[in-house]
UniProtKB/Swiss-Prot annotation:
The lineage of its organism: Bacteria, Pseudomonadati, Pseudomonadota, Gammaproteobacteria, Vibrionales. It is an enzyme of class 2 (transferase). Dual-specificity methyltransferase that catalyzes the formation of 5-methyluridine at position 54 (m5U54) in all tRNAs, and that of position 341 (m5U341) in tmRNA (transfer-mRNA). Pfam families: tRNA_U5-meth_tr (PF05958). The active site is at C326 (nucleophile), E360 (proton acceptor). This is tRNA/tmRNA (uracil-C(5))-methyltransferase.
Amino acid sequence: MTQSVMNPENYQVQLDEKAEALSAMFSEFNVPELEVFSSPAENYRMRAEFRVWHEGDEMYYVMFNQETKEKYRVDYFLPASRLINDLMPLLTEAVKESKTLRYKMFQVDFLSTLSGEILVSMLYHRQLDDAWKEEAKALKQRLNDEGFNLNIIGRARKMKIVLDQEFVIEKLKVNDDILTYKQVENSFTQPNGIVAQKMLEWAVDCTQNSQGDLLELYCGNGNFSLALAKNFDRVLATELAKPSVDSAQYNIAANNIDNVQIIRMSAEDFTDAMEGKREFRRLKDQNIDLKSYNCNTIFVDPPRSGMDEGTCKMVQGYERIMYISCNPETLKENLEILSQTHNITRFALFDQFPYTHHMEAGVFLERK
């Protein structure tokens, strides 16, 4: 994605093209009419990464053209949130004044929120010392005095200095509810906050009037688990990445939700546990009796590689399947199996990444 293709005046055209392409791609499955969820045309991305270029006394952000690999200067980044764009020039001006902060800094990562919090990670090709820490504390105080709610992380080879926390607290509006989410630096979060809210509302709408329990695979920080909890008696969710599991546990407590249980294990291991092929100590340690759950609905949000055949077969055992996909190609492959036993009753496009070819899709399937 280059600056030249990001024109808000062309936003609707590129969205219509995506919708047409996605509908055509899945036409063989007799899908219902596509529900299209748009993004803001600018300032939609809650995180951004920039290389830092030093040129004499000058210092500025750069990105690289993916095709030509040539660098280009970035003073304003149209996709990034207003919070990131407001902070970008103030940060560089402040860092330029400090030899300690400036020396061998090569990258800055921003993680912002709709709630107003922002986290800045400053990356260096040198080890950081107490002098850096004191200068960074002063920088943080200076920027917060200007109205930001900001924390700073300094990173170098095999070291990390956190001032004063390595996460932000996001608040997402889902219909009439406000849900609180802890989002940790360097762990996965939905990049487009507005579209993330629309995805949650769509998932809640699809599962209204559900009976029994929900099983969720690949739950991340509990993004969907928390929003869907009110539609089910209980939610049992799996996630392998420890930082995401820790965030999910925090989020469950922060939202006072008492019917969500998170297990740290892979989808493949969970499939073995459900089928009784193996026993897992972590299930016993958490006093989780899989047989006590009455899961009629399963929610899957797999990585780009999709689900393996064994997981697809396991998923087919549920009456209703909700599948969020960041890769339509692997979604299509998985639907070739799932559509043998289930009909697609809802079909959605979420424009998480405007001005790119990336398409986030959602399907809801019910047993034939």
